[in-house]
Amino acid sequence: MRESLKNSKRLVIKVGTSTLMYGNGHINLRTIEKLAMVLSDLRNEGKEVILVSSGAIGVGCHKLQLPVRPTSIPEQQAVASVGQSELMHIYSKFFGEYGQVVGQVLLTRDVTDFPISRENVMNTLESLLERGIIPIVNENDTVAVEELEHVTKYGDNDLLSAIVAKLVQADLLIMLSDIDGFYGSNPSTDPDAVMFSEINQITPEIEALAGGKGSKFGTGGMLTKLSAASYCMNANQKMILTNGKNPTIIFDIMQGEQVGTLFASKKEEFSHDGTH
């Protein structure tokens, strides 16, 4: 299964705020520059790449020198407005150093749920990829809301990245996180924690390990990643969860090395290869 990843042509890379920012609230320029280099080199190699990036509110807080993240929705959305433009400025600068053009795509749930606008998004992404441009996708935090009558939020960019992967029929979603993969117990408290190399089915037992009832693991962050993995597997797609602190790990994944946790349903092998 890992060997087949070498043939992946269309990739979606998801990067979270924890990878883009230091714990002290400052921007991790070293990681962002490495990420730009890796994705630009994949483009040079002939791969098609889409980046799903969080960080608008985090970068906005840094830009506005806010000591803590605002709690009210209007304030959060104002900070996201500043942060998103700053984030794109940083990406454009670093990708530009490697001769790569990027394009911003901001989405809300109602856009990808509604057939006509969803098709429009698909066409836009295809057009960007055809021109050799790397789309940088984020939720439109400035306008997205989550109300009973009108839900436009995805909830998190983990799910958004899985939705984007399905929209563009990506060969692989690589989710860069602050953990090496999916573990059977919390690696920060259990030195004997074992990481899963591959998961073929999201069972209730797997969900419980991710922070379900009675588990001390995580605060739900891993559950959202499992939801994204489940979404991918239901769409017959593959996802890898791995640590994003050094983005060159993406090269290792593309060489078929045992990096992170691969989520892939067994039926996926039959549907693509015709053999097991």
Curated annotation (Swiss-Prot):
It is found in: Cytoplasm. One of its GO terms (molecular function) is glutamate 5-kinase activity. It comes from the Bacteria. The keyword Kinase applies. It is an enzyme of class 2 (transferase). Keywords: Amino-acid biosynthesis, ATP-binding, Cytoplasm, Kinase, Nucleotide-binding, Proline biosynthesis, Transferase. Catalyzes the transfer of a phosphate group to glutamate to form L-glutamate 5-phosphate. This is Glutamate 5-kinase.
